[in-house]
Amino acid sequence: MSKVRVLCVDDSALMRQLMTEIINSHPDMEMVAAAQDPLVARDLIKKFNPQVLTLDVEMPRMDGLDFLEKLMRLRPMPVVMVSSLTGKNSEITMRALELGAIDFVTKPQLGIREGMLAYSELIADKIRTAAKARLPQRVLENKPAMLSHTPLLSSEKLIAIGASTGGTEAIRAVLQPLPPTSPALLITQHMPPGFTRSFAERLNKLCQITVKEAEDGERVLPGHAYIAPGDRHLELARSGANYQVRIHDGPAVNRHRPSVDVLFRSVAQYAGRNAVGVILTGMGNDGAAGLLEMHRAGAYTLAQNEASCVVFGMPREAIAMGGVNDVVELNQISQRMLAQISSGQALRI
């Protein structure tokens, strides 16, 4: 079996050494070279032809974003960003995903050996996924036209969306065309803590609806999208006649917290046939069982098609389980969601 060839770009010699040790400890991948800055990396890419690049966000001579933009324009390849956990870097990381990076990991606290095995497995999983991923299509920078289906504001109907690898840009593509009169949306995107607030704030600037990081106990309102906080589960709940957000630190489900299954199951319970469920690009099976529960509760369910997915894992599993009404290309999902809500199809059992 051929190994996945990886090239690391990081100005820290310690991080280059750590990444090399991690990659080479897995029998299905190898670190072919490591570069201290993008200008050195440019020559090493030509020499070693890596399949996956790990790229530091902040570096001398040329920063990670500038290099990524040039790389995706001149020699597109799967890139996993490596970022320190700061507010500034979380915003840069979100921008990197817009430019075409497949995924990202946070830098570990060097010198702390506890948890390094889990960190090694996390990096290896992201490398394997990136090696198989379809490079994402860039979403247009300008705002798309508002959709023609403009449903009346409704506090009963809502949309639940789940995504993983490639999901940040897929979610952006789904939310940007939505009018302010859209029903409420609850969204679980697999993401570590420290990044979801920047993700929500960036979407809020780009969208006509209000997008925010979800807060425990807040009322679910039409025209709003609520993003699950990193490392915390998002659920729908009821408070009298109103929907409410529930955020909690329950155990990981399908190895994930937040978990798409946790969200979808709560929506099946409390919204039933008043909901539309959407499963987007991502590795694994998180969300498949929950979407089936939504389907059985009367919700209308959609899956992103393989051709438009970065990774067709989660949608494939949901389709295989029989919980999907329609399989739709990414750029058609917004229209289909609102069409179903407007026509009342989401209310049919």
From Swiss-Prot:
Gene Ontology process terms (BP): chemotaxis
Catalytic activity, EC: 3.1.1.61, 3.5.1.44
Active site: 164, 190, 286
Coiled-coil residue windows: none
Subcellular location: Cytoplasm
Enzyme class: hydrolase
Keywords carried by this UniProt record: Chemotaxis, Cytoplasm, Hydrolase, Phosphoprotein
GO molecular function annotations of the record: phosphorelay response regulator activity; protein-glutamate methylesterase activity; protein-glutamine glutaminase activity
Record CDD domains: CheB_Rec, REC_CheB-like
Record PTM: Phosphorylated by CheA. Phosphorylation of the N-terminal regulatory domain activates the methylesterase activity.
4-aspartylphosphate sites (modified residues): 56
Domain of life of the organism encoding this protein: Bacteria
Annotated Pfam families: CheB_methylest (PF01339), Response_reg (PF00072)
GO cellular component: cytoplasm
Catalytic reaction equation(s): [protein]-L-glutamate 5-O-methyl ester + H2O = L-glutamyl-[protein] + methanol + H(+); L-glutaminyl-[protein] + H2O = L-glutamyl-[protein] + NH4(+)
Entry remark concerning the domains of this protein: Contains a C-terminal catalytic domain, and an N-terminal region which modulates catalytic activity.
NCBIfam families linked: PRK00742.1, PRK12555.1
Family: Belongs to the CheB family.
Function statement: Involved in chemotaxis. Part of a chemotaxis signal transduction system that modulates chemotaxis in response to various stimuli. Catalyzes the demethylation of specific methylglutamate residues introduced into the chemoreceptors (methyl-accepting chemotaxis proteins or MCP) by CheR. Also mediates the irreversible deamidation of specific glutamine residues to glutamic acid.
HAMAP family reported in the protein's UniProt record: CheB_chemtxs
The name this protein goes by in its record: Protein-glutamate methylesterase/protein-glutamine glutaminase
Organism from which the protein derives: Yersinia pseudotuberculosis serotype I (strain IP32953)
Gene that produces this protein: cheB
